[in-house]
Amino acid sequence: MALWGGRFQGETSALFKLFNDSLPVDYRLFEQDVVGSIAWADAIASVGIITATECSDLKKALNDLLVEVNGDPAIILASGAEDIHSFVESALIAKVGDLGKKLHTGRSRNDQVATDLKLWCQSEGAALLARLQSLHAELLALAEREFDAVMPGYTHLQRAQPVTFGHWCLAYVEMYERDISRLADALTRANTCPLGSGALAGTAYKMDRHALAAALNFASPTLNSLDSVSDRDHVVELCSTASISMMHLSRMAEDLIFFNSGEANFISLSDEVTSGSSLMPQKKNPDALELIRGKTGRVYGSLVGILTTMKALPLAYNKDMQEDKEGLFDVVDSWAICLDMAALVLSGLKVNRPNALLAAQQGYANSTELADYLVSKGMPFREAHHVVGEVVVAAIAKQIPLEEFSLAELKTFAAIIEDDVYPNLTIEACLAKRDVLGGTALPQIQQAIAAKKAR
């Protein structure tokens, strides 16, 4: 039986029931709904709605239901209930009879679902934080293993300056640290309890909402009942945080896909995270990374979906808000598996040092060093930049690297060039000169790794 049937004389159409029912989605809130109901039983007992014995009986029945459903989750969907709240209430009434009908006193599904969803976000958010921290640790370990593996750094996907693979790893370590901070911050803001807000105006029973919030491990109760039942900022923030993190994961995946390609061949991926072709027997495809990149779009879509759903809703609750869960659940599932998969990819990744070094030695990545050398001899940088551009054009024409020009040839471009130019053009010199906080010099990378490990 529907929880709202008394007002209606006609039958609900089968099509409307299919359209309206949310149990196939919100069944995932079962545990949170039971936990919230147990806390609510204590709350209504505290204001005399039920006796201590009745409260004890309700809580026992709810805990029994929790055990039963955990043993056979199919019970929920087989019930045909409208939503998870209806399922729990109906199952409770089946266990304790009319006593079960008292539980919803002073409570609305509006504050009930808002509470369930915040509890779910807190639980899943904590698990996501752990996954982010695991990925962070895996990437930091890779940075430590390969801190001195030289590779080209890119701008515009063209070789720019030499860096190390450890430096590349640390760039993504920074991104994931921001993701960790962002998620923790979002969970702090979501740590307020809406229960006791009723449908929109607050419950009619003068209970201690601070105690109710504490019973559910929230930091505090919400402060405005209209906002409490209509707020979905925590859903938006979780989807937004996931979207930013997925953007970082996708960028990392794209880099690694390129590094793994035959054109670069800087790294090799484990067989664990690659697949083959049904036609071409030589193929070893980076499917794990491509799927991370592909799943990013669906996470973005869910963020846009919840923002669009919420953008024009009047206060307080509207049925549109039932659409908040499907996208959120998919976001959390997608983000979680992508974090796990990214960590697995990194754990089996091998750097092809000779190929990466060879690529760094090509493409005139030491051009900036020559310009800096000219500056050290007194030439203004803008003039030095122009001179080195001419040197590069000549080197391309001769198909040689800059360091293979004779001193006499280099002097035709700038008479101030001397023999001491050549040590400045080595890969080692290119790296060593970037000995500044955040730079790619090996001591800076080692210090950065040590500092992050010490946290």
Swiss-Prot record:
Pathway: Amino-acid biosynthesis; L-arginine biosynthesis; L-arginine from L-ornithine and carbamoyl phosphate: step 3/3. Keywords: Amino-acid biosynthesis, Arginine biosynthesis, Cytoplasm, Lyase. The keyword Transcription regulation does not apply. InterPro entries: Arg_succ_lyase_C, Argininosuccinate_lyase, Fumarase/histidase_N, Fumarate_lyase_CS, Fumarate_lyase_fam, Fumarate_lyase_N, L-Aspartase-like. GO terms for molecular function: argininosuccinate lyase activity. One of its GO terms (biological process) is L-arginine biosynthetic process. GO terms for cellular component: cytosol. Gene3D superfamilies: Fumarase/aspartase (C-terminal domain) (1.10.40.30), Fumarase/aspartase (Central domain) (1.20.200.10), Fumarase/aspartase (N-terminal domain) (1.10.275.10). Its EC number is 4.3.2.1. Its main location: cytoplasm. The keyword S-adenosyl-L-methionine does not apply. It catalyses: 2-(N(omega)-L-arginino)succinate = fumarate + L-arginine. It is found in: Cytoplasm. PROSITE patterns: FUMARATE_LYASES (PS00163). Belongs to the lyase 1 family. Argininosuccinate lyase subfamily. PANTHER family: ARGININOSUCCINATE LYASE. This is Argininosuccinate lyase.
